[in-house]
């Protein structure tokens, strides 16, 4: 147990904080969530290294630095309601909860949704509702959302998600073509949307009605 705590602290210090992530809430969340419980057992020893790892079904858990950056761009606060598109392992949702948010997370692959539920339960993470459906269509039942986080590559920002963003809310997503995307943040001000871009990234595809029609 002590070694895992040390690994997490080293991960935050050298992979995240040293590379410019400063939000105290995000740093504490990254220190507190046991990432090794969200990766397959064969990769548990690599859980705190700064690279993505496979979780099955051609999906991955993002590298810790990218998780921290996307969370900082979203800047979740205590009491926020966050919509996550692409649950994956459940790790990103756990980080959002550790920041004080409640999360609705949508995953399109049933086996991956089940994996995330098991991982979240094993890690003792509550305040996450995992749904299995097309996340590009949003989830109007609980809208509007203080933040929306898309954890897969989208060719454009899905219109339903923009509509479900609360006034003052932020949407963070990798937007671009099949080879490379730009990490993008959109902030809503009533009926206007302010867009900022934060550099190149590469993610697995966002499949759905308002995403890519098929994987590549």
UniProtKB/Swiss-Prot annotation:
EC number: 2.1.1.77
Reaction(s) this enzyme catalyzes, per UniProt: [protein]-L-isoaspartate + S-adenosyl-L-methionine = [protein]-L-isoaspartate alpha-methyl ester + S-adenosyl-L-homocysteine
GO cellular component, as recorded: cytoplasm
Catalytic residues of the enzyme: 62
Keywords: Cytoplasm, Methyltransferase, S-adenosyl-L-methionine, Transferase
Molecular function via GO: protein-L-isoaspartate (D-aspartate) O-methyltransferase activity
Annotated coiled-coil segments of the chain: none
Keyword Transferase among record annotations: yes
Entry's localization field: Cytoplasm
Gene Ontology BP terms: methylation; protein modification process; protein repair
InterPro entries for this protein: PCMT, SAM-dependent_MTases_sf
UniProt entry tagged with the keyword Lipoprotein: no
CDD domains listed in its UniProt record: AdoMet_MTases
Domain of life: Archaea
Function recorded in the entry: Catalyzes the methyl esterification of L-isoaspartyl residues in peptides and proteins that result from spontaneous decomposition of normal L-aspartyl and L-asparaginyl residues. It plays a role in the repair and/or degradation of damaged proteins.
Family membership noted in the UniProt record: Belongs to the methyltransferase superfamily. L-isoaspartyl/D-aspartyl protein methyltransferase family.
Listed name of the protein: Protein-L-isoaspartate O-methyltransferase
Organism: Methanospirillum hungatei JF-1 (strain ATCC 27890 / DSM 864 / NBRC 100397 / JF-1)
Gene that encodes the chain: pcm
